[in-house]
Amino acid sequence: MEVTMEDVAGDFEFSGCGSTTTTSSASSLDDGTGMCYAWGELSPVADWANFCCSDDDGGHDLHGLIESMLCDDTLVGVDDDGQAGLHHADMFRDDLYCYGNGSNPSSTTTTNPGSPVFDDPTQGCPEKGLRLLHLLMAAAEALSGPHKSRELARVILVRLKEMVSHTASANAAASNMERLAAHFTDALQGLLDGSHPVGGSGRQAAAAASHHHAGDVLTAFQMLQDMSPYMKFGHFTANQAILEAVSGDRRVHIVDYDIAEGIQWASLMQAMTSRADGVPAPHLRITAVSRSGGGGARAVQEAGRRLSAFAASIGQPFSFGQCRLDSDERFRPATVRMVKGEALVANCVLHQAAATTTIRRPTGSVASFLSGMAALGAKLVTVVEEEGEAEKDDDGDSAGDAAAGGFVRQFMEELHRYSAVWDSLEAGFPTQSRVRGLVERVILAPNIAGAVSRAYRGVDGEGRCGWGQWMRGSGFTAVPLSCFNHSQARLLLGLFNDGYTVEETGPNKIVLGWKARRLMSASVWAPPPLPVPSSPPEGVCQPVVGMAPVATGGFARTEFDYIDSFLVEPAYALV
């Protein structure tokens, strides 16, 4: 009988992967401040010597890592409208887009702060840009507030569509503001028509975005990886913190709240197998958290297959499994299979404007995951999230300002956020390029629609101002980022265009921004210590149920709740 990954609740072991390691030569890079770092000796997440070189020298750069996870035959296809998807061979043609680094690649700050996109709204026609901005705000006001009028909103949206209609054909003359306004107009129209899941769940949002061809999604994601630091910034920071935390452990278990395409873990695997001290790579086990039902579980399985194939290709001992959220999207620690002796790590990537994941899970779901991983005795928790203007600092009093301002304020917050993303992508993605259009259509447009829908519902709560305050209030403590991690972030930004900034807002947190706008942050935390069971009074017999202390600092759980349901299934090797 053929058994698929969806039928198996356990891990997918790669017993054929030995512990042989490849030792990279130590190489030093100047970070621009006169200090030289021996990257090879410290086994960084990114092999910077190779990352900065071309493929001709045989180096395993990050682009190669990503491309190795994408099958060529998945990048060609036909969309629902009959148009062919972008072929893998076309992705690097010069006539499609240009990779234009800034004149000063080591710079991570800018001397030209201001509101991006709005600085030059329509490339020579600022009046039209201001009109678009005012009409968008008026449409948002017409959809909410004490004087809302759906008919007025409909009239305004008709006018907006007339003003941006030429952007539908990816007209080279369309400005950044016009293209951005077109997507926000569509998002508002979706609210008016009820085509966006205003009152629906995350699964409905996933279904709404599933019509894009899988090859187009992967292609757009890879292009976004190549042309911007949005994904790499959070991934590299989290991975470096994980490497440092588990450097002495022989078995590592990462529970990933939103694995997406699984790209984050390729660089971690490479770092584990290329330690300069010759220590064999630890066994890595990744458990991906998925939603109950169809599409989410299948996407996780595909990510697991790609990661498993990549691990086998570099000799990384690896196994992969998944656990599902409850129907109300709550995380239950009992669904995670625990093995004695593993260093447990929680990875939580949330709310990214430039990502293929368009769904923002409820704050209650995120909170249940963070508290659940603390209850399991996680050694480290990494959090990557969007950075809102309401969170100027973790200790400020402006946490609820965005929510207090209602839909219009939150709508304008999202408009400013995506205008910064648009502006930052312009240097790497010329407006007229096919790749730029693909990224906008497949990634940014669905994310804008989701952001506007969430703002309309006002569902973000504490998630809008970041999780720092909640985690401190729940007993989590900040884990300071190493100097190495800070330097790695600065080097990463040096590979891209001027205008990107990196800012330290706490000992455990760094923020990626574009000019004056904060966009996303990465932070590292340690969960509160597990409570030690109290001893019963002398002479009193008190049975211990499922919480006996163990040497690893965690606790043993009842077999009924935590183990039996997983061990009935055999492990399968994927070839």
Curated annotation (Swiss-Prot):
Segments of this protein annotated with the region SAW: 453-526
Composition skew (Low complexity), residue ranges: 103-116
Species for this entry: Oryza sativa subsp. japonica (Rice)
Domain GRAS: from-to ranges: 123-526
InterPro entries: TF_GRAS
Region spans: VHIID: 221-286
Similarity comment: Belongs to the GRAS family.
Segments of this protein annotated with the region PFYRE: 344-450
Keyword line: Nucleus, Transcription, Transcription regulation
Role, per record: Transcription factor involved in the control of strigolactone biosynthesis in roots through the activation of the beta-carotene isomerase D27, which participates in a pathway leading to biosynthesis of strigolactones.
Other known facts: Plants silencing NSP1 and NSP2 exhibit reduced expression of the strigolactone biosynthetic gene D27, reduced levels of strigolactones and increased shoot tillering. Rice NSP2 is a homolog of Lotus japonicus and Medicago truncatula NSP2 genes, which are transcriptional regulators essential for Nod-factor-induced gene expression. Although rice roots cannot form root nodule symbiosis, rice NSP2 is able to complement a NSP2-deficient mutant in Lotus japonicus. Rice NSP2 is able to complement a NSP2-deficient mutant in Medicago truncatula.
Name assigned to this protein: Protein NODULATION SIGNALING PATHWAY 2
